[in-house]
């Protein structure tokens, strides 16, 4: 398969870096059905936390529920960070077809959207980071206190309830046109979400031998696990552009930060300034002291010969990821097919 150059136009140079982003001429809003569905996906897992606390207050949390929650959190979380993000979005490495499929399925069970839309939105975010065109910048409403607070809410959650479509044809043409396996998995997203809830229930029922055990596993390893992973991911979009350190140089107006407190829960994604300084690098934590479980897993895949062409070090000025003549170019190595 021939690699597809993924080059996106950047924002015109007129943006001053502090003003609110221009509003669309005719602001679009999500319809009733999308809003209702989004609300259910976002609110139901969060409400389950209240049910979980109520149950824990009376009878405690079983070791089975906690272990299942950790297992499903790790599997689906790494599916997002290693699969959706570093493999499919940035092509930080190539993987055997079966491993690509496993990671894509695991990421799809995180309730964060189908993989093609996820990839398209994230590539658009990198093309227009913290400037007009960025789908989830906390600086959307300017850099004043009120604007930042409103932007933080938008970047974390509010953007999910607006309708600013990101074209997969523009930002993920490689997956749409040349990757039938990923296209099938993307279309199976509703079924994989159902499996993400049913599997914890089935496991809890099988291990405990009771329907109650299945129900508590459904709450802790299903709904609460989903809520925690969602908010950790969204915190990278919001907090990791506003709070933390910026030790590495990124593109103009890019305010991505490193936030150590989220490193473990986000599997290394919160080393966001390091990531934005070199997006195609498989390691986001740029020093040995910066824990990056996603990079460790990619390294394991490489040692097992399940992954190759791993991009560990920042490239030179002629490297794969660069900004040239006002355009943002993503690494275009071709996924291995055998």
Residue ranges and their predicted role:
Residues 1, 275-276:
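Short conserved micro-motifs at the rims of enzyme active sites and ligand-binding pockets
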Residues 172-180, 245-271, 278:
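Active-site-proximal inter-transmembrane loops
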Residues 92, 242-247:
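Helix-loop boundary elements of multi-pass alpha-helical membrane proteins
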Residues 1-234, 239, 281-338:
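Non-catalytic, topology-defining segments of multipass membrane proteins
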């Amino acid at each position: 398969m021939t690699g597809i150059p993924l080059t996106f136009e950047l924002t015109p140079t007129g943006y001053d870096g502090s003003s609110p982003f221009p509003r669309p001429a005719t602001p679009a809003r999500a319809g009733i059905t999308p809003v209702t569905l989004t609300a259910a996906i976002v609110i139901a897992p969060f409400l389950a936390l209240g049910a979980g606390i109520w149950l824990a207050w009376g009878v405690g949390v079983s070791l089975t529920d906690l272990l299942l929650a950790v297992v499903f959190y790790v599997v689906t979380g790494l599916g997002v960070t290693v699969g959706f993000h570093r493999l499919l979005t940035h092509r930080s490495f190539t993987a055997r077809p079966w491993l690509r499929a496993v990671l894509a399925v695991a990421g799809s069970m995180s309730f964060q959207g189908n993989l093609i839309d996820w990839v398209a939105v994230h590539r658009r975010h990198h093309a227009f980071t913290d400037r007009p065109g960025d789908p989830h910048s906390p600086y959307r409403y300017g850099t004043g206190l009120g604007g930042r607070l409103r932007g933080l809410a938008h970047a974390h959650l509010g953007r999910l309830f607006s309708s600013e479509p990101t074209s997969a044809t523009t930002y993920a043409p490689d997956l749409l046109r040349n990757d039938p396996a990923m296209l099938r998995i993307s279309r199976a997203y509703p079924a994989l979400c159902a499996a993400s809830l049913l599997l914890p229930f089935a496991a809890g029922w099988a291990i405990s031998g009771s329907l109650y055990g299945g129900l508590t596993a459904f709450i802790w390893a299903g709904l609460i696990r989903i809520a925690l992973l969602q908010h950790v991911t969204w915190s990278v979009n919001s907090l990791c552009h506003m709070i933390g350190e910026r030790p590495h140089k990124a593109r103009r107006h890019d305010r991505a930060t490193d936030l150590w407190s989220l490193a473990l829960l986000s599997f290394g994604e919160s080393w966001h300034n390091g990531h934005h300084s070199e997006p195609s690098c498989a390691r986001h934590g740029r020093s040995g002291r910066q824990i990056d479980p996603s990079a460790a897993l990619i390294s394991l895949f490489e040692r097992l010969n399940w992954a190759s062409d791993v991009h560990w070090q920042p490239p030179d000025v002629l490297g794969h990821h660069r900004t040239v003549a006002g355009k943002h170019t993503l690494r275009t190595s071709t996924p291995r097919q055998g």
